Amino acid sequence: MGTASSGEWIAILLYFALVIGVGVYFFIRDRHVEGEKEYFLGGRSMGGWVAALSAGASDMSAWVLMGLPGSIYLYGIGKVWIAVGLVIGTICAWVFVAPRLRRYSIRANDSITIPQFLTNRFQSKNKGLQIISAIVFVVVYCIYSASSISACGTLFNTVTGMSAKTAMIIATAIILVYVFLGGFNAVCWTDFFQGMLMLAALMLTPILALFVMKGADFVAPVMAVPENYYNVLSGGGFNWKSMSDIISGLGWGLGYFGMPHILVRYLSIKSEHEMRKSQIIGCSWILVILAMSAVVGLIGRQFLGEIDKENLVFVHMVRRLFPAFISGVLLSAILAAAMSTADSQLLASSSAFASDIYKPVIRKDATDHEMQWAGRIIVILISVVAFFIAADPNCGGIMALVECAWAGFGSAFGPVILLSLYWRRLTYSGAVAGVCVGFVVDAVWYAFLSSSTGLYEIIPGFLCGLIAAVIVSLCSKAPSKEITDLFDRAFEPTD
């Protein structure tokens, strides 16, 4: 598949020009606007469509166009449980977390980051939880961003023949430009366009493949289908392999309750009306995207036959079905998926460092302008670290990096976010315990028990974090009346 045609190059270069142009536009438009809330949260001005598609696109990394179709192409429909878990998790997050978190964050001293919200929720002057959370953010986002950079490198290497490392450098530089210049507004608007592109690519490709396969001149490739390929129970029955795949797949849904770059989209929505619109759009988008991604994997096996790398099934189908320029546009959807996730992760880690480490610890009297530049510098540093992780041949690949980071966030922050929104007895000490225990159990399980048990580490990490937060809260002094009063009025509509 080595060399891209001129049509594909034109389409990909136009895509790059678009995302850079968005960053430049918002830099020029907002260059006189001061305030960390504007740069890191877009001034809480996002409409329903932009917020919903930005949340979806920043969530669905290149995994949805490479990892999921590839795993279903190779192993069969039994691998669909991750997609089912993600759909359930997305719907639950939009319904049970998004509106309450937005309202509570406004009333909790207008918090603009998740660590800031957790601290303000307890009206605490102790910055320990805020700092611990921000450190976890920066560490895990280095790993998560590496998966997106790796995906860009894989695509460019496959389509153009360019070396993977060179491609990673180019992708990292482009992401840096529009995040550095435009901040949250640029990230959300590029995510909006990228979300639309991903949807179009996943809708068009399998539908056209079906039409081609029904043609009289289509000769189906001969390819053996593995045992249980069309069985939703990957182990062929109700055995531990099937159950662990189902539990682990559904467990991915728990990650949404603690995913900072998705949660911050909820904070940015400008009104109650736009929130309701976002809920409908966000849930519908994720359902269609994941369903069509699975269909690509199933149809790809019948359409393509044997291919060398299963995670390139979407790439092969697009290049075989469409003329060069359209092929380039649709292949840009993979770049869109990777870059929309990376930009959101970089901005979330940037805001966490500036608001939760730089100002509370390093320079307490830092101005808004200075904090913006502190955030921009950390974006560069994290990008460099993420590049070296992605370039390491022993990093484990896109799926391994995503699994690791997703579980880390879900285990550390998922239980605490849910308890902070639904349990007025949660204490500051309980929240600290939940974050620390969830993160440590997740890391230990990943290192020593994940392979032998077949159970995804987010399950034990989330449960242990939840138990730790509840036990420590019950053993510590009850929250003050001021804290419980804030909790009681936090969920009244804001407009």
Where are these regions (language model features)?
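Membrane-embedded helix-loop-helix hairpins and adjacent transmembrane boundary segments
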Residues: 1-495
